[in-house]
């Protein structure tokens, strides 16, 4: 046994882990509320997703709509959503990365790093 008892250190570690867990939960809630945008075709198609990757809005400029070429429009939509999701992942890394490192670094299920 450690002189002076080992329990205060264990208690301190437990409190630290609980604080990190709470900080992580708070960051995840903030991500779910934060919206980021991606665009394609020079802004003709814009997608908005939450920081957790949920698609919230899609705006298509009428100039992007060509009844004879729906394939290009579909490609622009996919590209805009992908760009928005990349921005959401960058935000996740920014918000959650430091917290994950505090928990022993990466490898946490459900986190993209």
UniProtKB/Swiss-Prot annotation:
Signal peptide: none annotated. GO terms for cellular component: bacterial nucleoid; cytosol. One of its GO terms (molecular function) is DNA binding. It is found in: Cytoplasm, Nucleoid. InterPro entries: YbaB-like_sf, YbaB/EbfC. Its main location: cytoplasm. Keywords: Cytoplasm, DNA-binding. The keyword Transferase does not apply. The keyword Cytoplasm applies. It holds the Pfam family YbaB_DNA_bd. Belongs to the YbaB/EbfC family. HAMAP family: DNA_YbaB_EbfC. Binds to DNA and alters its conformation. May be involved in regulation of gene expression, nucleoid organization and DNA protection. Homodimer. This is Nucleoid-associated protein SAV_4556. It comes from Streptomyces avermitilis (strain ATCC 31267 / DSM 46492 / JCM 5070 / NBRC 14893 / NCIMB 12804 / NRRL 8165 / MA-4680).
């Amino acid at each position: 046994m450690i002189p002076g008892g080992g329990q205060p250190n264990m208690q301190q570690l437990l409190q630290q882990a609980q604080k990190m867990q709470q900080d992580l939960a708070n960051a995840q809630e903030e991500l779910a509320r934060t919206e980021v945008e991606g665009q394609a075709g020079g802004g003709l198609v814009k997608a908005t997703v939450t920081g957790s990757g949920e698609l919230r809005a899609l705006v298509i400029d009428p100039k992007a709509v060509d009844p004879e070429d729906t394939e290009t429009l579909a490609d622009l939509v996919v590209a805009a959503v992908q760009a928005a999701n990349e921005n959401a992942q960058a935000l996740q890394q920014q918000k959650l990365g430091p917290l994950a490192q505090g928990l022993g670094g990466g490898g946490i299920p459900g986190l993209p790093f």
